[in-house]
C-alpha cells in the first residue's frame, strides 16, 4: 500500500513538473523575442552574462552612509554598474570609465520636514575584466564596539572611539529614547 501511494505521489509530481516545464519560457533574447523550443543559445547566454554595465538597484544608504537622519524616497536608485562574469577566475569585472548622474530624491526628516533635493550618484559607463587585486586586510588595532551589534555602531579608526549610528533626534521622532550604551532606540523610562 505504501509503495502504491508513493508511486502515485511521484507520478503526480512528475506530471506537474512536465506540465510546468511545457509552459515556462526561456529568458527573452532581444526585444522580447523568444527562441524556438525555449532554449537560449550559448553565444547569447555568453554575450549577455559577460562583464558589462548593467542597471542595478543601489540602496541610497550604501552611497550616503552618513546621512542617517533622513529617510529617502525612493530608498534605492537605478544606476549603471559593472556586473557579469569574466572568462578567468583570476579576473574581475571593474569599471574603466565612470560618470556622475544627478537625481531628484525626497529627503524626509520624520515629524520635521520633507523636501525634494538633488543627489549625485556614480555610474559605470565602461567595464573590463582585469586581474584581481590582492587585498590585504589592514591590521585593525581597535577593539570592536560590540561583537553582537556591530551594525549599530560607527568606530573612528584613528581614535577607536565608538559612537551610535542612531541619533537622539531619530529616536525621539519615533517617541523613543536613545540608549547610548546599546545604541538602540528604547521606550522611555517612567
From Swiss-Prot:
Question: Which InterPro entries does this entry report, sorted A to Z?
Answer: Cystine-knot_cytokine (IPR029034), PD_growth_factor_CS (IPR023581), PDGF/VEGF_dom (IPR000072), PDGF/VEGF_growth_factor (IPR050507), VEGF_C (IPR027928), VEGF_C_sf (IPR036841)
Subcellular locations according to the entry = Secreted
Would you list which residues are glycosylated? Answer: 100
UniProt lists the family membership as follows: Belongs to the PDGF/VEGF growth factor family.
Q: Which cysteines are joined by disulfide bonds?
A: 51-93, 82-127, 86-129
According to the lineage, what is the superkingdom?
Eukaryota
Which Pfam families does the record cross-reference, listed alphabetically? PDGF (PF00341), VEGF_C (PF14554)
Question: Can you say what this protein is called?
Answer: Vascular endothelial growth factor A
| Key words of the record | Angiogenesis, Developmental protein, Differentiation, Disulfide bond, Glycoprotein, Growth factor, Heparin-binding, Mitogen, Secreted, Signal
Note the subunit structure. Answer: Homodimer; disulfide-linked. Also found as heterodimer with PGF. Interacts with NRP1. Interacts with isoform 2 of BSG. Interacts with CD82; this interaction inhibits VEGFA-mediated signaling pathway.
- Give the signal sequence positions: 1-26
Protein role: Growth factor active in angiogenesis, vasculogenesis and endothelial cell growth. Induces endothelial cell proliferation, promotes cell migration, inhibits apoptosis and induces permeabilization of blood vessels. Binds to the FLT1/VEGFR1 and KDR/VEGFR2 receptors, heparan sulfate and heparin. Binding to NRP1 receptor initiates a signaling pathway needed for motor neuron axon guidance and cell body migration, including for the caudal migration of facial motor neurons from rhombomere 4 to rhombomere 6 during embryonic development. Also binds the DEAR/FBXW7-AS1 receptor.
Query: Record's GO cellular component, any one?
Result: extracellular space
- Organism per entry: Mesocricetus auratus
CDD domains the UniProt entry points to: PDGF (cd00135)
